[in-house]
């Protein structure tokens, strides 16, 4: 799944920032490159979020407890960035497994993931600064924790690194792919949907400033040792709109298949863009398919276009459910989750629900599907061992409670939805 960036010409309502100041004392040489998200950008301006609260001042007032590492520290932690310890690689650079001392108990070590950003000039620097600024001041059980950072000159030039908590169970994308030796059970998929909704709700609505993720996708949802899902990779995140503005205008960046249609067409970014991406992700969980897969037959390459004909007939609806589940799910649970996806995929961005409303709907589905389990996280099933305008709360509840033939299609009018 490739990322994209296309400029949209002159963006007159783009928020402008003063020249940045390095987040680390030894990174002054890079300041000339500029960034929208440096600490001075946060503290030296007075923009206010769409909720009417002072976004940047609120961010700067939050305590930043990030550790500052040296290149030497991280070489030691990763065995000199050993290829055998590489756990991820992409356009951003490479990610290595490592260990660092536990500050609370120096006799113990903790596992970490060290992201070494590639040399992509200004864009790479901006993404590094964005992650430091955002993840340095936010904390939530469904966001991957940033532990520290490093920005330092060595013989190869300026090195930019980020140190995260280690997520041993990889990404949701991996477990939905044929590469995975295990299958995410339906109950676990529901929990992942709930965890992801919690993370987005926190970013959009639970702070005194709003963060728009902008690159919500299954590969950016990681799983910890308890299979709790956490959002990761905030390099493309943006602050929400300032007062009097309905959106943030910006270059269109993200991942093909997840980006909201109005964002692609106009470059106007709102939190409802993330809601669209969440709807696409729900259909990934249901079908086990990627949003855009060129290896599929022509009529099946775009996920949203492929599922559309099956939504008008509840008997045929089963045909889009991930066959690796082998029928081990309650069909009404799947159908109700599809209703949530359809609400998120409403063509009119203003009519999409807020993430807090989405979270409430998904939570009800989880509770109905897993009664009496004591809140325990469902487990994986090894593949080889398997046997076989704004939506109102009242309307959302009615939609979820009614599951008769044709309702799926009625909620998602094919004329109003276009696959990206």
Swiss-Prot record:
Region (Disordered) location: 1-64, 369-396
Modification Phosphotyrosine occurs at: 164, 263
Domain Protein kinase: 81-366
Catalyses which reaction(s): L-seryl-[protein] + ATP = O-phospho-L-seryl-[protein] + ADP + H(+); L-threonyl-[protein] + ATP = O-phospho-L-threonyl-[protein] + ADP + H(+)
Keyword Kinase: yes
Polar residues compositional bias, start-end: 22-36
Subcellular location(s) of the protein: Cell membrane
Functional summary from the UniProt entry: Functions redundantly with PCRK1 in basal resistance against bacterial pathogens and in regulation of plant immunity. Functions together with PCRK1 downstream of the pathogen-associated molecular pattern (PAMP) receptor FLS2. Contributes to the induction of SARD1 and CBP60G, which are transcriptional activator of ICS1, an enzyme involved in salicylate (SA) biosynthesis upon pathogen attack.
Family: Belongs to the protein kinase superfamily. Ser/Thr protein kinase family.
Protein name, entry field: Serine/threonine-protein kinase PCRK2
Protein's organism: Arabidopsis thaliana (Mouse-ear cress)
Organism lineage: Eukaryota, Viridiplantae, Streptophyta, Embryophyta, Tracheophyta
